[in-house]
Amino acid sequence: DREDIKHWLNLSRNGFADKLHKTYPMLDKTFLDICYLAALGLSIDEIAQYAGNIKRRSVERYMSLICQEVQYPMSGKKGFESFINHILTI
């Protein structure tokens, strides 16, 4: 469940979920879920499975949309990974 994942991320990843929500409050629940699962180190295929059995291509599209939404200077899978790593380090 989302609250359990948020709690675990805050404990194990230096407050990741709280930092993400505070810094980017415009992200909707689907975008947050994708970010949370990526921060746990899941692959695109695993994210697709845990996000409700969506298609791999949908996850890749969400990653690009998240980068656009937060106005991250990079996009696509590499940009999204960079964005997640940035949040993990702040």
For the regions a language model picked out, list residue spans one by one:
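Cytosolic nucleotide-binding catalytic cores of signal-transduction proteins
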Residues: 2-90
